[in-house]
């Protein structure tokens, strides 16, 4: 059966909090956007704009980074990889309108073309994802050239495809016809993986609110402290060497009567009272009413601190362990 590439074919996979994740899912990442950078000066231009070391990016790997303002506040967090004749710059679609003009601001002085891409973004997730990629796109490395696009390994359970629109439908049908257990999902399943793996993100509602260390970007190798100057570097360096950062990103979980949105406020318990605690960056609401989220909080809280959503005060939330260390490497 041929499947037309239509967002309506990709629906939320109903999962309870105790359910196992699908063994294989194809995800429509329509909440994400891609910028491409092409030209002789693409590497040097981007190197002076972002927190990661673009110069050291291997051809077969991807890295995290942030694009900050002069005060070190992040406009966006992105995943960077080699794509077609240049770079692919993956970020949340909601920040594209405010971030792209800033990234292009000085491009007129360099040999670099920076544009929003029309490529379709698809995710492949689950314990079978790696084997499926090896079957259809064999090769070495975590970034692979495929027909009309690129395949990028995100983590042990996920691959990302950035592919031309005319090839997207063919890819979908190939995977559906070859693997009868593949589930088609909307982007909420990708959100769940990002929360479980504590992958930071910035949306329009949280843009220019946080410095990179406040969302653990250093813990996912998204900051180079050895590269040359870039916009916002002074603040990022002070946060590391002078300890000015007082926040971090954590995983929290609890019951929710309605979907918790990015930018929602989380309150924390202080004795018998409640005070503003932090800001929600990403979340997933299970079918049984449990929710899990990434939240920026003060980094000196007791692990026993309780939380609640400001607009849903009846449900108590608690903190979960991060999958990585926040200690300096």
From Swiss-Prot:
PANTHER family: TRANSFERASE CAF17, MITOCHONDRIAL-RELATED (PTHR22602:SF0). One of its GO terms (molecular function) is folic acid binding. The lineage of its organism: Bacteria, Pseudomonadati, Pseudomonadota, Gammaproteobacteria, Vibrionales. Folate binds at residues 32, 190. This is tRNA-modifying protein YgfZ. Its main location: cytoplasm. Keywords: Cytoplasm, Folate-binding, tRNA processing. GO terms for biological process: iron-sulfur cluster assembly; RNA modification; tRNA processing. Belongs to the tRNA-modifying YgfZ family. Disulfide bonds: none annotated. GO terms for cellular component: cytoplasm. Folate-binding protein involved in regulating the level of ATP-DnaA and in the modification of some tRNAs. It is probably a key factor in regulatory networks that act via tRNA modification, such as initiation of chromosomal replication. It is found in: Cytoplasm. SUPFAM superfamilies: Aminomethyltransferase beta-barrel domain, Folate-binding domain.
């Amino acid at each position: 059966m041929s499947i037309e590439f239509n967002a309506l074919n990709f629906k939320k996979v109903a999962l309870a909090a105790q359910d196992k994740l699908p063994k294989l899912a194809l995800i429509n990442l329509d909440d994400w956007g891609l910028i491409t950078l092409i030209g002789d000066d693409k590497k040097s231009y981007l190197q002076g704009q972002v927190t990661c070391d673009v110069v050291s990016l291997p051809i077969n790997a991807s890295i995290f980074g942030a694009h900050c303002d002069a005060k070190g506040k992040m406009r966006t967090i992105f995943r960077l990889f080699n794509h077609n004749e240049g770079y692919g710059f993956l970020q949340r679609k909601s920040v594209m309108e405010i971030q792209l003009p800033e990234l292009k601001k000085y491009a007129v002085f360099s040999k670099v073309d920076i544009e929003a891409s029309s490529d379709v973004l698809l995710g492949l997730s689950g314990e079978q994802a790696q084997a499926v990629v090896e079957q259809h796109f064999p090769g070495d490395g975590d970034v692979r050239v495929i027909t009309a696009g690129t395949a990028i390994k995100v983590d042990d359970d996920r691959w990302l495809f950035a592919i031309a629109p005319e090839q997207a439908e063919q890819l979908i049908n190939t995977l559906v016809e070859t693997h009868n257990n593949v589930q088609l999902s909307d982007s909420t399943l990708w959100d769940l993986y990002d929360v479980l793996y504590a992958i930071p993100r910035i949306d329009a509602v949280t843009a220019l609110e946080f410095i990179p260390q406040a969302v653990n970007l250093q813990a996912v190798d998204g900051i180079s402290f050895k590269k040359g100057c870039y916009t916002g570097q002074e603040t990022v360096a002070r946060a590391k060497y002078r300890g000015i950062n007082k926040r971090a990103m954590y995983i929290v979980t609890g019951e929710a009567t309605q979907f918790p949105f990015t930018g929602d406020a989380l309150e924390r318990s202080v004795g018998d009272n409640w005070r503003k605690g932090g800001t929600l960056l990403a979340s997933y609401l299970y079918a049984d009413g449990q929710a899990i989220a990434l939240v920026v909080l003060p980094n000196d809280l007791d692990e026993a601190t309780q939380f609640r959503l400001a607009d849903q005060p009846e449900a108590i939330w608690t903190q979960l362990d991060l999958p990585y260390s926040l200690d300096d490497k």
